[in-house]
Regions:
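N-terminal Rossmann-like NAD(P) cofactor-binding subdomain of oxidoreductases
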Residues: 1-155
Length: 155
């Protein structure tokens, strides 16, 4: 397992998708984690485990995103729309799981297995979006075929 050397925030940490993010962090990275769990004011103070560490949930509305390098957003389009630009303006790269930014031309739509190499070209904090789950699964399956035959359209 790799050590996690990034400061990370999980927005929507108390929800189902937020918990999956935490599980992935726990299962794929060892050692101490500089992790900030963010949710609504009503969840503030709640303790959540990730690996052998306990983390206190913080109020998203007052969080200083300059404290983290990457924020995973999984709290819905409205929350992403309000807080993702704020995070970027404070120097944090956002990986957004909502539909909010999927159709924005200047925001990359990334599936790591398909076009993750695009991330190597990014130097400044930005918002990164991902497609919905069925699109992602389809494109992961089509990628090896595209590499051989250059698929230009899927109907």
């Amino acid at each position: 397992m790799k050590n996690l050397n990034k400061r990370i925030a999980v927005v929507g940490a108390t929800g189902a998708v937020g918990r999956v993010f935490l599980e992935l962090l726990e299962n794929n990275f060892s050692g101490k984690k500089d992790l900030h769990l963010l949710a609504s004011k009503k969840s503030e103070g709640k303790l959540i485990s990730c690996g052998d560490q306990q983390f206190e949930v913080k109020d998203l509305s007052t969080f200083d995103f300059s404290l983290v390098d990457i924020a995973f957003f999984s709290a819905g389009a409205e929350i992403s729309g309000e807080f993702a630009p704020k995070a970027v303006s404070q120097g944090c790269t956002v990986i957004d799981n909502s539909s909010k930014f999927r159709r924005e031309e200047d925001i990359p739509l990334i599936i790591p297995e398909v076009n993750g190499d695009v991330l190597k070209q990014i130097n400044d904090p930005i918002i990164i979006s991902n497609p919905n789950c069925s699109t992602a699964q389809l494109l992961v399956a089509l990628k090896p075929i595209h590499d051989l035959f250059e698929i230009t359209r899927v109907d």
